[in-house]
Amino acid sequence: MRYKTSLVMRKRLRLYRNTLKESSSSSGHHGPQLTAASSPSVFPGLHEEPPQASPSRPLNGLLRLGLPGDMYARPEPFPPGPAARSDALAAAAALHGYGGMNLTVNLAAPHGPGAFFRYMRQPIKQELICKWLAADGTATPSLCSKTFSTMHELVTHVTVEHVGGPEQANHICFWEECPRQGKPFKAKYKLVNHIRVHTGEKPFPCPFPGCGKVFARSENLKIHKRTHTGEKPFRCEFEGCERRFANSSDRKKHSHVHTSDKPYTCKVRGCDKCYTHPSSLRKHMKVHGRSPPPSSGYDSATPSALVSPSSDCGHKSQVASSAAVAARTADLSE
């Protein structure tokens, strides 16, 4: 049986060589222009799909040569050997009339469902626009409006072209609609940190595996890492309290429990509720169907949006706080 198969293959190979000689002598092309209908006897395996193959699979690994099939299907798990590659090149040249150097351009196979996934895999080009108001000698500053494809390019442009070097005496943010409204910073690094609010740059990633959080300031990253390490370096300053906190802001909020100070007051008209902790105020605001303005949990200052100095509750809490501090001072002096 094996001898009979070998004999058949030799006859087909001999027939193929004779066909090449005849076509090359009568045509000036790189290879014979045999159509799929005229050569089934030479390469029957190239035109007959195996029964177990589905339309979404490549045929015999010849997908890369422009043969009909799903051009976006996954490649074979094992690359073909040198003999298979040479046979494939010869077959493609015979079927399409292309030489070996032109096979890369012959990929116009019928588009299958994989074309959609190829489109989805294309990277989405983003444009980052510089909205710095640059003075150009006129009364009204003009918008920079330069576009960049990466965050690094935008940040470098703003830092070098607009913020400037040490020769700049006034560290003012001229970003469009900046809420500081021309109020200068005391140092250049503070201005650079502030600009990240506008650009969205967050150059400080969490180093712990699987976290994935990034931060705009190194101080915030330092505080965040304590959630992984469990470090709580800020101890409550009141005697007898062993509570510890990861940042000074949480410790300050906790201190209101000891002083009876309630600086977080409800801003809704007619409501005089006040609380010692902002979380209690957030729960209360749900009664009104509102939520207090968001504030960073890493700020050491009390959120001004939540404090009402004119409130009676706030005044009473300040009096109670002063009395508690005075009593504690008297105890320590004794």
From Swiss-Prot:
One of its GO terms (molecular function) is zinc ion binding. It comes from the Eukaryota. Keywords: DNA-binding, Metal-binding, Nucleus, Repeat, Zinc, Zinc-finger. SUPFAM superfamilies: beta-beta-alpha zinc fingers. A zinc finger (C2H2-type) spans 128-162, 171-198, 204-228, 234-258, 264-288. PROSITE patterns: ZINC_FINGER_C2H2_1, ZINC_FINGER_C2H2_2. Pfam families: zf-C2H2 (PF00096), zf-C2H2_15 (PF23561), zf_ZIC (PF18366). SMART domains: ZnF_C2H2. Residues 20-60, 282-334 are annotated as: Disordered. Its main location: nucleus. InterPro entries: GLI-like, Znf-C2H2_ZIC1-5/GLI1-3-like, Znf_C2H2_sf, Znf_C2H2_type, Znf_ZIC. The keyword Hydrolase does not apply. Residues 297-311 have a biased composition (Polar residues). Belongs to the GLI C2H2-type zinc-finger protein family. Binds to DNA. This is Zinc finger protein ZIC 4.
